[in-house]
Curated annotation (Swiss-Prot):
GO BP terms in the entry: cellular response to diacyl bacterial lipopeptide; cellular response to triacyl bacterial lipopeptide; inflammatory response; innate immune response; toll-like receptor signaling pathway
Protein name as it appears in the record: Toll-like receptor 2
Residue intervals annotated with topology Extracellular: 21-587
UniProt signal peptide: 1-20
Alphabetized GO MF terms: NAD+ nucleosidase activity, cyclic ADP-ribose generating; transmembrane signaling receptor activity; triacyl lipopeptide binding
TIR domain location: 639-782
Keyword annotations from UniProtKB, A to Z: Cytoplasmic vesicle, Disulfide bond, Glycoprotein, Immunity, Inflammatory response, Innate immunity, Isopeptide bond, Leucine-rich repeat, Membrane, NAD, Receptor, Repeat, Signal, Transmembrane, Transmembrane helix, Ubl conjugation
Organism of provenance: Ovis aries (Sheep)
InterPro entries linked: Cys-rich_flank_reg_C (IPR000483), Leu-rich_rpt (IPR001611), Leu-rich_rpt_typical-subtyp (IPR003591), LRR_dom_sf (IPR032675), TIR_dom (IPR000157), Toll-like_receptor (IPR017241), Toll_tir_struct_dom_sf (IPR035897)
GN (gene name): TLR2
Membrane topology: Single-pass type I membrane protein
């Protein structure tokens, strides 16, 4: 018994592990190219069952704690492995040994307290390695990256426990495109630790304090192109001229991101610009200046320029003591070589005239998302301000008058590109003054409703997108590019107004269609973006859009941007894919064909009616319906005649001179109903026939060739037949006045043919000796 229990327990454990492995493997989603996604699946281990077909594996943001030697051994073709944001604390020595094709490895934000070079010894082609955010204090006891000759991007360190950088740490690395070191609590930097790297394109350095910054800078200044300093408090930074002045530097760009300055530390940074002579571009992003701009004039007098800095970018600069800030006149002389300045979202409301005049080399100025108005712009763009300025960006400021803005900028003789978008101009005056060399103007998102002659005729590029324009009727003879998207235009502009236009973006309007003729009218048009409009997919438009292969080379957002809005059955479909029926595309031809078919049908119907007595059948049907409306059987007291006599006019002599004499003068006499004598004058013939038959006990049909040719006799026969079959009585008496061949009876006399086949009839004898018997039989038939 215990043996059986032990066996059951073992099988249960195996079953649990098998089900767990199966569930984890099924939690991955893999596409045919071998890209497997296991991101955020609450996995606690690497799924089993991975094969050589897997080329990219994303297991980030899970709860994996351990990477074993066998977990990835079959993934020999794996190129990308993401294990970031897990709980990994242990990686076995040979976990990555079989991943010889691995190019991208992310182990960031786990719980690794020790790093081993054995992990990477077979990763010869690895290009990207991210080890950020783990718990290690150093980069290991041996050279961690010596087996990674092709590594181009490396990210190491953490914000708390990483405190030391040693000389061996980066041995074996010669060239890196990007190196990120997160060392907010760095306490030890061994000189020349970064010296072994011969070239670093971009170094991102997280330092909380600047104590070791200069030591690091000394090692990399000759091999670094771009230094980015993040999350650093530079209040205590001091630049030692002797440390760096004689070194041949290669740094081209310097970025300060989320860095704090004081007035004194800013002066030290400016000194750095001057001595690290290779710096061409400086960027301050989301920085804080804890000072009032009191830059000691004596200190700055020794610095003639901001080194060779040509581009200065300032974004989101915070100045807590903004209202105590100095006029910055002490730094004016340093700005003479600067060519490009961007000061964005920093509450700038004025550029002093004197500073503008000192910016003698400035070609590009961007003051976006600030507080500039016409009143302050007047002082900033004073006489001799920005003498060589070509591009001015005043996007999203507080400008309100287009006329005044243009007038204030007349001092900028070389200005050719002006961006005043996202200001609230609302309207445009009829005339304006602009600098004489204006070629580009951006008026997008300014809420203007119409365009006037205010725009300069020298424009080559105009952007008026995202406004309230419903038409474009300006003559701009030099305009090459027009951006007029997200307005209310219903059609393309007239090409005669824009003779040299080569680029037009007019998406997001209410244009229903455009034609080949319209596009051909723009002789130099090379790019048209017209998607996002409500196209009516008419036959002509679809024929043009789908039949012009060259159209795809002109329409930059073809085919996905072009959707049908009408007709309803193709709404939402791409214009390229929409199909209309033959009746929609050739309506006139279809209507003509239908009319012709109807005419032929009517003509054929007329011919058939004439040939087969169709009119006669319709009259008979009408009479039949009239008869149906009459009571089925008249009461006995309403019977006025013994018999109604139906005969042809050609047989009237026999009826009136023989039959009437024999029946009405017999004793007792029979009362006959004859149409000549008893029909009510003025009453419709059909009604007379119906009434007479219904008021007679019997109906006598005098059959002859003439009877067969008579339509009225046919009606009388039909109504009698109606009584005969619908009322189940013997009302009909047939008298064959002359021999009639049944086959000769016309088809329309179907009832006569039927009666002659089913009932007996009296035949008028040619032998006078038999006539007495004829009359006797007739009287008996009437009485029955």
């Amino acid at each position: 018994m215990p043996r059986a229990l032990w066996t059951a327990w073992v099988w249960a454990v195996i079953s649990v592990f098998t089900e767990g492995a199966s569930d984890q493997a099924s939690s991955l989603s893999c596409d045919p190219t071998g890209v497997c996604d296991g991101h955020s699946r609450s996995l606690n281990s690497i799924p089993s069952g991975l094969t050589a077909s897997v080329k990219s594996l994303d297991l980030s943001d899970n709860e994996i704690t351990y990477v074993g030697n066998r977990d990835l051994q079959r993934c020999v073709n794996l190129k990308t492995l993401r294990l970031g944001a897990n709980e990994i604390h242990t990686v076995e020595e040979d976990s990555f040994f079989h991943l010889r094709n691995l190019e991208y490895l992310d182990l960031s934000y786990n719980r690794l307290s020790n790093l081993s070079s054995s992990w990477f010894r077979s990763l010869y082609v690895l290009k990207f390695l991210n080890l950020l955010g783990n718990l290690y204090k150093t980069l290991g006891e041996t050279s961690l990256f010596s087996h990674l000759p092709n590594l181009r991007t490396l990210k190491v360190g953490n914000s708390n426990s990483f405190t030391q950088i040693h000389e061996k740490d980066f041995t074996g690395l010669t060239f890196l495109e990007e190196l990120e070191i997160s060392a907010q609590n760095l306490q030890l930097y061994v000189p020349k630790s970064l010296k072994s790297i011969q070239n670093i394109s971009h170094l991102i350095l997280h330092l909380r304090q600047p104590v070791l910054l200069l030591d690091i800078l000394i090692d990399i200044v000759s091999s670094l192109d771009y230094l980015e300093l993040r999350d650093t408090n530079l209040h205590t930074f001091y630049f030692s001229e002797a440390s760096i002045s004689e070194i041949n530097t290669s740094v081209k760009k310097l970025t300060f991101r989320n860095v704090q300055f004081t007035d004194d530390s800013f002066v030290e940074v400016v000194k750095l610009f001057n001595y690290v002579s290779g710096i061409l571009e400086v960027e301050f992003d989301d920085c804080t200046h804890d000072g009032v701009g009191d830059f000691t004039a004596l200190t700055l007098n020794r610095i003639r320029y901001l080194g060779n800095v040509e581009t200065l970018t300032i974004r989101k600069l915070h100045i807590p003591q903004f209202f105590l800030f100095y006029d910055l006149s002490s730094i004016y002389p340093l700005t003479g070589k600067v060519k490009r300045v961007t000061i964005e979202n920093s509450k700038v409301f004025l550029v002093p005239c004197l500073l503008s005049q000192h910016l003698k080399s400035l070609e590009y100025l961007d003051l976006s998302e600030n507080l500039m108005s016409e009143e302050t712009l007047k002082n900033s763009a004073c006489e001799h301000a920005w003498p060589v300025l070509q591009t001015l960006v005043l996007r999203q400021n507080r400008l309100k008058s287009l006329e005044k803005t243009g007038e204030l900028l007349l001092t900028l003789k070389n200005l050719n590109n002006l961006d005043i978008s996202k200001n609230n101009f609302l309207s445009m005056p009829e005339t304006c003054q602009w600098p004489g060399k204006m070629k580009q103007l951006n008026l997008s998102s300014t809420r203007i409703h119409s365009l006037t002659q205010c725009l300069p005729q020298t424009l080559e590029i105009l952007d008026v997108s995202n406004n309230n324009l419903d038409s474009f009727s300006l003559i701009l003879p030099q305009l090459k590019e027009l951006y007029i998207s997200r307005n209310k235009l219903k059609t393309l502009p007239d090409a005669s107004f824009l003779p040299v236009l080569s680029v037009m973006r007019i998406s997001g309007n209410i244009i229903n269609t455009f034609s080949k003729e319209q596009l051909d009218s723009f002789p130099q048009l090379k790019a048209l973006e017209a998607g996002g409009n409500n196209f009516i997919c008419s036959c002509d438009f679809l024929s043009f859009a789908q039949g012009q292969q060259a159209l795809a080379r002109v329409l930059v957002d073809w085919p996905d941007g072009y959707r049908c809005d009408a007709p309803s059955h193709v709404r939402g479909q791409r214009v390229q894919d929409a199909r209309l029926s033959l009746s929609e595309c050739h309506r006139a031809a279809v209507v003509s064909a239908v009319c012709c078919a109807l005419f032929l049908l009517l003509l054929l119907t007329g011919v058939l009616c004439h040939r087969f007595h169709g009119l006669w059948y319709m009259k008979m049907m009408w009479a039949w319906l009239q008869a149906k409306r009459k009571p089925r059987k008249a009461p006995r007291r309403d019977l006025c005649y013994d018999a109604f006599v139906s005969y042809s006019e050609r047989d009237s002599y026999w009826v009136e001179n023989l039959m009437v004499q024999e029946l009405e003068h017999f004793n007792p006499p029979f009362k006959l109903c004859l149409h000549k004598r008893d029909f009510v004058p003025g009453k419709w013939i059909i009604d007379n026939i119906i009434d007479s038959i219904e008021k007679s006990r019997k109906t006598i049909f005098v059959l002859s060739e003439s009877f067969v040719r008579s339509e009225w006799c046919k009606y009388e026969l039909d109504f009698s037949h109606f009584r005969l079959f619908d009322e189940n009585n013997d009302a009909a008496i047939l008298i064959l006045l002359e021999p009639i061949d049944k086959k000769a009876v016309p088809q329309r006399f179907c009832k006569l043919r039927k009666i002659m086949n089913t009932r007996t009839y009296l035949e008028w004898p040619t032998d006078e000796t038999h006539r007495e018997a004829f009359w006797l039989n007739l009287r008996a038939a009437i009485r029955s």
